[in-house]
Amino acid sequence: MDKKTARLSRSKRTRIKLRELGHTRLCVYRTPRHVYAQVISGDGSTVLVAASTVEKDVKAKCKYTGNVESAAIVGEIIANRCKEKGISQVAFDRSGYKYHGRVKALAEAAREHGLQF
């Protein structure tokens, strides 16, 4: 089993558990150049809030979009957008990635700005 297949099987396992519980989840996806975050409803059918380093306002704030600082900016933006929509509590879906680096920075920035995991 290669790295990508192992990550996908880990993510599938956690998503099944989160869907059974019916919690709204903060889903993270990363590429070498960008970080994406979405808040998805409990049934998994609709995206309620989204933010990424592809957006112009995020690109203006950071020099490079594939690092820890830009992931923290995305975490801050996603938390603020959740507040506007009235979402205060989510389950963190790290998509099979290790809780380290950009994933950790995004999660901690979202927590600091009022989002509860």
Curated annotation (Swiss-Prot):
Organism for this UniProt entry: Francisella tularensis subsp. novicida (strain U112)
GO terms of biological process kind: translation
Domain of life: Bacteria
Pfam families (alphabetical): Ribosomal_L18p
Protein name: Large ribosomal subunit protein uL18
SUPFAM superfamilies referenced in this protein's UniProt entry, alphabetically: Translational machinery components
Physiological role: This is one of the proteins that bind and probably mediate the attachment of the 5S RNA into the large ribosomal subunit, where it forms part of the central protuberance.
Entry GO MF terms: 5S rRNA binding; structural constituent of ribosome
The family this protein is said to belong to: Belongs to the universal ribosomal protein uL18 family.
GO cellular component: cytosolic large ribosomal subunit
SUBUNIT field: Part of the 50S ribosomal subunit; part of the 5S rRNA/L5/L18/L25 subcomplex. Contacts the 5S and 23S rRNAs.
Record's keyword terms, sorted: Ribonucleoprotein, Ribosomal protein, RNA-binding, rRNA-binding
Alphabetized InterPro entries for the sequence: Ribosomal_uL18_bac-type, Ribosomal_uL18_bac/euk
